[in-house]
Amino acid sequence: MAEQTHVLFVEDDDVIREATQLALERDGFAVTAMPDGLSGLEAFRANRPDIALLDVMVPGLDGVSLCRRIRDESTVPVIMLSARADSIDVVLGLEAGADDYVTKPFDGAVLVARIRAVLRRFGHASGPNSRPAEDSSAPDGGVLTFGELEIDTEGMEVRRSGQPVALTPTEMRLLLEFSSAPGTVLSRDKLLERVWDYGWGGDTRVVDVHVQRLRTKIGQDRIDTVRGFGYKLKA
């Protein structure tokens, strides 16, 4: 029997927490559900789940702070849950290291689809230390060099001026997408499709925040913004 995917779900609303836990368990997930951020952090450290769903407004340790604490310790995928798609909390969550977000109220099927999409691009097999899935757009084997930046496409490692750069799997997939076509402008919609596995329109803020996070790690001038079109990696 295949090992169940373990989901950490942190939500303070009892009705939402219990209903969502039941829906996820019916879909085959193992779920640890916690009502606040501090107990959520303890559960994360004790169980090392495969993915974390964090409500932004949980008490004790809010969802954004919890995401930041998790990201300090792990590259496990994180999805933020927010009652408002236009909330600054969404951007703060992405800046803290979240990989995606879902707006409340949400349909259970939509949430499950988003979870599975995130796990696919993380190459989920046996837990949070799994490497990103193979991507047909990624360059074939070897080390790519762009100035002081080196990308090992087989070892999934990045160095800047000889020093290792720690990237999350989503950041790595984004960099691989850029490096597969250096100098070519990639639209936000194309990046959502290729990196986030969206077969439909998504929130381009997800792309913008991840590009900015990537820039802080590989160099602000390595990725250019082409206003009105998208982004490109300097060849």
Curated annotation (Swiss-Prot):
The modification 4-aspartylphosphate is found at residue 55. GO terms for biological process: regulation of DNA-templated transcription. It is found in: Cytoplasm. PROSITE patterns: OMPR_PHOB (PS51755), RESPONSE_REGULATORY (PS50110). This is Transcriptional regulatory protein CseB. Transmembrane segments: none annotated. Residues 6-119 form the Response regulatory domain. GO terms for molecular function: phosphorelay response regulator activity; transcription cis-regulatory region binding. Residues 141-235 bind DNA. Its main location: cytoplasm. Keywords: Cytoplasm, DNA-binding, Phosphoprotein, Transcription, Transcription regulation, Two-component regulatory system. It comes from Streptomyces avermitilis (strain ATCC 31267 / DSM 46492 / JCM 5070 / NBRC 14893 / NCIMB 12804 / NRRL 8165 / MA-4680). It holds the Pfam family Response_reg.
